[in-house]
């Protein structure tokens, strides 16, 4: 059981109880992946709804209401544990580094189709640092600075060690007519 506090009913200082009905792993977010908590109550992220466990500890916040007919009355929440390092940075007056991609690990089936190991960029976010440097959707990120990248978690680890304003040399592999060719870009890390 969890408590939803803030304004889950639309009224300030309201509280309702509920459950986390499902935890989705590997949900794509800018520059990484996260877990997403599915709750069994109707809460709107625009209203300021926070989730507490029964010990009173903050465990997440509601981000959006699910609109699909089969999931009506449910909400999506972000678990606070996934954002601990960001919260520490922000509370110390340090901006969060921003590369500007959505990506996924190259799966075994993708490897079987000839896609090289790395992070498959599903979207190079418009006007983001990666996009501005020339990185495109469909590219495979294989090196970030001096670190070979074979998974999104490795990329996230590199980003946590990077500062806004740093220039990082990255290597991607891009599909040409019959092969993937390596291209190196210098990307100026942004802030968010």
Question: What are the language-model segments listed below?
Answer:
Residues 54, 58-114, 167, 180:
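C-terminal cap/linker of serine protease catalytic domains
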Residues 1-12:
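Short glycine/Trp-rich loop-beta-loop segment that forms part of the substrate-binding cleft
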Residues 88-98, 136, 142-144, 156-192:
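PDZ-domain C-terminal substructure recognizer with occasional recognition of PDZ-binding tails
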Residues 7-8, 64, 146-147, 173:
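Short, surface-exposed secondary-structure boundary micro-motifs
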Residues 48-50, 112-115, 129-140, 161-163:
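A short glycine-leucine-enriched loop at secondary-structure breakpoints
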Residues 1-3, 51, 141, 168:
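Generic structural signal for buried aliphatic residues
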Residues 59, 130-152:
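Conserved PDZ fold ligand-binding element
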Residues 14-73, 111, 117-123:
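Active-site region of chymotrypsin-like
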């Amino acid at each position: 059981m969890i408590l939803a506090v803030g304004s889950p009913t639309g009224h300030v200082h309201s509280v309702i109880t509920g459950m986390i009905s499902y935890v989705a792993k590997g949900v794509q977010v800018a520059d990484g992946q996260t877990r997403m908590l599915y709750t069994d109550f109707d809460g709107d992220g625009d209203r300021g709804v926070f989730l507490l466990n029964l010990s009173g500890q903050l465990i997440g916040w509601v981000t959006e209401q699910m609109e699909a007919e089969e999931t009506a009355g449910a909400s999506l929440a972000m678990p606070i544990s996934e954002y601990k390092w960001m919260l520490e940075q922000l509370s110390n007056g340090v901006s969060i580094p921003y590369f500007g991609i959505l990506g996924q690990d190259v799966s075994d089936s993708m490897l079987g189709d000839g896609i090289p190991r790395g992070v498959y960029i599903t979207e190079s976010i418009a006007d983001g640092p990666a996009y501005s440097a020339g990185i495109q959707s469909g590219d495979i990120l294989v090196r970030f600075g001096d670190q070979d990248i074979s998974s999104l978690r490795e990329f996230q680890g590199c980003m946590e060690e990077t500062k806004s304003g740093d220039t990082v040399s990255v290597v991607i592999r891009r599909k040409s007519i019959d092969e993937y060719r390596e291209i190196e870009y210098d990307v100026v890390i942004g802030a968010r």
